[in-house]
Amino acid sequence: MAKDLSNQIVDVCRFSYAGEGGFASATMEQWALEAMLYDPARMKQRFVLFEQICLPSLAAQTDQDFTLIALIADTMPYRWRRLKDLMAPYPFLQVCTLEAAGPLNSTRRAFRRGWDRHSKFITGFRIDDDAVACDYIAKTRAVADQLLKLGWADEDTPAAIAFHRGIYWNMNSQEKPYWEFSEIGPLGLASAMVTHNDSLANVYRWNHRKIAANVRTWCDPNDVMFVRTLHGVNDSNRSIPPLPS
């Protein structure tokens, strides 16, 4: 009997999720974290980036067989829960509401929420205020399926897929806002992880800079696969890579 290598692609986006740890604000008191995350000006920009950059790039995918889980906290003010209104024009989008929890626990539950209940494996990726290439899902699926066939990923062994090259968009620069750059290792953006559907691990398990030190990793530094935004409201300590000489 042929082995079951069925594989579902699921993205989890922590949408201003007031959880415990995982970002630069991890040391803040919960009330201060929520005040920062739900600041009206910050939330308005968050929605603009999500609606104008992230969602359109996913809607343009050549392979539409995927699920996007927007993870929000149960403390999010009601006015910002209009996020759920976006589920109608974007059928791949689901909203998952959870209490505050650590990054691995919360994202594991969010991935389970997006699971179709029959695929044996989940290829989970992450996206935030950014865009991925229109063929990102198709290419990620093709690589993931090959990794499963080769045994690089199985029930007990996860494997990562990382595309390193993309376009950086510095929203604070008018002179040279865009440039192409290839990272030396995996980013959180345009990286995915193939795991068993009941695995304790997922793409949030390790800092993206440490994924290749902990998981078998397939890398592609050649294809331009993302647009990464650089702005003032992201809380992931994003750094600006060197401009081309």
What are these regions (language model features)?
Residues A2-S6, V12, I184-S245:
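C-terminal catalytic/acceptor-binding lobe
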Residues D65-T75, T97-E99:
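Short beta-strand/loop segment that forms part of the nucleotide-sugar
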Residues A35, I53-D65, P89-Y90:
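Short, acidic, metal-binding catalytic loop of nucleotide-sugar glycosyltransferases
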Residues S119-T123:
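Short acidic donor-binding loop at the edge of a beta-strand
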Residues G102-H118, V132-T217:
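Conserved catalytic core of nucleotide-sugar-dependent glycosyltransferases
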Residues Y17-Q45:
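A solvent-exposed, charged loop/short amphipathic helix patch at secondary-structure junctions
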Residues Q8-C13, S57-L58, F66-L71:
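Hydrophobic targeting segments
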